[in-house]
């Protein structure tokens, strides 16, 4: 886990469901788990306990309708980007489209879906003042935020069969990087290339997600 827990003890809670099928629970180590269909987020907030709780509430409220929003525009999102691409309505869908603009004929906005969900969740949580550091991990596609004087480190490993860290990447608040994503033929999504694993750092998780997909498919 990249962030310290600030000595705040958060007990394990029971899984809580909403009417649309989304579920959430608080995990040990001050982490929030959100899951709905294929979307599975682990969130860490570095800040006072009240700030953490408010940020988690923001994340839960925004997360609940995200999958349904994406499903309503799914046929369009599965279309390769082109200069006459139709307008999209959903905030996450717009992030996905922005991440692949200019990549005519190469990939669809779906290449950025995991990163875009992470970005959206991070940004709504940042509406809560007092957060020092924040990380939203969507199956390895990570959006994060840093305040002045803070940093985070990410571990990178090559093979899931041998999960020893290959290297670590340190990022401080002066860096423009706010997104990390990994792709490859060993991952959970289809990859047409030969790369075992490609990790990309970018200004957003959506950009990192789309870029890693492109490189891994080469």
Regions found by a protein language model. Name each.
Residues 36-49:
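Generic N-terminal amphipathic, Lys/Arg-enriched alpha-helix
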Residues 29, 38-40, 195:
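A general secondary-structure signal for short beta-strands and their flanking turns/coil
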Residues 99, 137-218:
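Conserved mixed alpha/beta catalytic, RNA-binding, or beta-rich assembly cores of soluble enzyme
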Residues 26, 46, 53, 79, ...:
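A near-ubiquitous, low-amplitude feature marking generic local secondary-structure context
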Residues 22-35:
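Acidic, low-complexity proline/glycine-rich segments
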Residues 2-12, 19-22, 49-137, 203-218:
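Alpha/propeptide regions of enzymes that mature by internal proteolysis
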């Amino acid at each position: 886990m990249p962030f310290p827990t600030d000595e705040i003890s958060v007990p394990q809670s029971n899984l809580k469901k909403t009417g649309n099928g989304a579920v959430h629970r608080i995990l040990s180590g001050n982490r929030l788990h959100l899951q709905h269909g294929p979307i599975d987020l682990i969130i860490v907030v570095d800040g006072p306990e009240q700030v953490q709780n408010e940020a988690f509430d923001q994340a839960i409220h925004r997360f609940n309708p995200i999958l349904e929003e994406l499903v309503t525009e799914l046929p369009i999102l599965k279309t390769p980007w082109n200069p006459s691409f139709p307008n999209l309505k959903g905030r996450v869908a717009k992030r996905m489209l922005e991440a692949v603009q200019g990549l005519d004929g190469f990939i669809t906005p779906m290449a950025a879906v995991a990163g875009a969900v992470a970005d959206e969740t991070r940004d709504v949580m940042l509406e809560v003042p007092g957060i020092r550091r924040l990380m939203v991990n969507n199956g390895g596609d990570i959006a994060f935020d840093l305040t002045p004087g803070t940093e985070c480190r990410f571990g990178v490993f090559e093979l899931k069969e041998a999960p020893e860290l290959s290297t670590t990447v340190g990022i401080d608040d002066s860096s423009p990087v706010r997104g990390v994503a990994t792709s490859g033929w060993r991952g959970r999504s289809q990859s047409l290339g030969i790369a075992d694993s490609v990790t990309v750092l970018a200004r957003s998780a959506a950009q990192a997600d789309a870029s890693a997909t492109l490189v891994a498919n080469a």
